[in-house]
From Swiss-Prot:
Signal peptide: none annotated. Belongs to the ATP25 family. It comes from Kluyveromyces lactis (strain ATCC 8585 / CBS 2359 / DSM 70799 / NBRC 1267 / NRRL Y-1140 / WM37) (Yeast). Its main location: mitochondrion. This is ATPase synthesis protein 25, mitochondrial. It is a peripheral membrane protein. Residues 1-36 form a transit peptide. The gene is ATP25.
Amino acid sequence: MHRSYAVLLRNNVARLCYRPGSTLFIRNFTTRHSLRQSKPWYLDISENKEEDSNSPFIKPIRFPPTEIPASLETISKYLNDKLAVTDIVVFDTAHSSSATSIQSMASYVLIGTVKSFRHLQNCNDELIKFIKETFDEVPKSEGLVTSGILRKRQRRLGRKTNLGKIAKIENDESGWCLIDSNVDGLFINIMTEERRDDLNLEELYCRVEELDQYKKQINLNPPAEEEDDVLLGLRKLMMKNTKRYYSTVGESPKPTFLEALTIQDLDSASKLIKEEKKPYHVIASALGRLPNHIELDAENWIKLFNEATPTEGPLDYEYWGARFKFFQLLYISKRNNIEENTQLDASTIKEFNRELNYFINDFFRFKQLALCQPTREELIGFLEICIQHLKLSKSYNQLISVNMWILKALQSYQYSDPKVVHDPRVIKLLVKSMHTENTNLNSLYEYVNLITNEFEVRSLTNDVIKEIITTLVESENWPTLFKFWKQCLCESAVDSNVWDFFIKSLLNKNDKVILSDIVDNGHLLWIHRSKLVISDDLKASLSKLLDRVDGSHTNIKKLLKL
């Protein structure tokens, strides 16, 4: 019975589906159903509409009117778009007229608002990671209570039930972090809205014309507390009678020894000397990091370095290297400040001369008193300083003063290393220190005669020989020049390069008597005697020399194959 009824029902439905009028309806129904089933309902999501930037509830990023680097815009958009930091304001402190200490540390300051303390922690971690990956810099974050420290405080405060509310208050007060991005001098302040309203940093960093816009409005009629709040009264009474044996406010972080030196807080650095294993090395390193144009208090810096000198045990090589570098950096900083001053007077140079004289008395004599011998590298470094010092004033008195300092320094090597004056590096610097563009000392010629008679000219480098030739040609001291040149030829200390330099120096001076003497007195025959390989440059110089001297000089040209 039931089976026949089911068969009949199926046949009737089949005939109905195959009717001409209802075929199209069934097909359309089937197509719609299959299309609807091909895309599930949970994937049928309408595309997000773009945010309306003109909405009064969405504040755009406010950049300064001055030109900003691309990195600043990248970081600001990342904070706003990816980390949901709102109300972002960027201030240009580098071009600001306000006298704040942030100008010496940061060029730009960014201020943004987060929703909660947990949001602040996440933004701090993600932003540091983003800067490391994008700009390959390591930012430095301060002021944020990390999650680990926060859990320790909560466990400590949770041991007493009557202090349970304090932890929440402390968390709310720590909703601020400062990040030094190390990218184009950008400092980033991220804080909660309550903390931002409380600090009002915009008033500190804004321009003078924007001061009224960011000035904090003081509410003269604050809402009165509810006097019938029994719980509030009990809480105040409990806090009043509770005796705490600890502080719930964290101590402000003390600057390290290097940080105190960087900001030139020498008093704080003096208190931290004992915490460093080798403070003298840190002092020299910190002094080298300071900008060249910053004016230094040399007296207090020297006093601090003397405090860092070890009082027990011998002073090692590393200490003396740091001390010499320290005095070098002090001199360079002082000289840069003097060179920036276009109006150089005699009193300024005289004071600077006294400081350089102190360099000799302090370093070289102190090292001898400590039973340590100065090295050649220290003498060479000091001679280089003296030569740079001659550029400030090219007077004859300045030349005498510099040579007196050099003489004092050389006396420190009289017994420990007397052969230091035979070092080619020292000889070259000593010759340079005895003359300027228009002034020469008589000791210069005496020193060259000493080199000619007592030293091994063969051991001199080409640079030393060229320096002596240049000095004597400019001063036109021909007897001393030819005496030295003859000794160089006798010891076979002259190659093709030096010969070319010697002839070109005489050609530039263009003294026809001297040029004729070179050709007529047989100086050029030394080229043939020493079997010197004549280079192309030397051939050209010899041809110019013979052309300027009267006569055909056929024999010399044939002998030298010119």
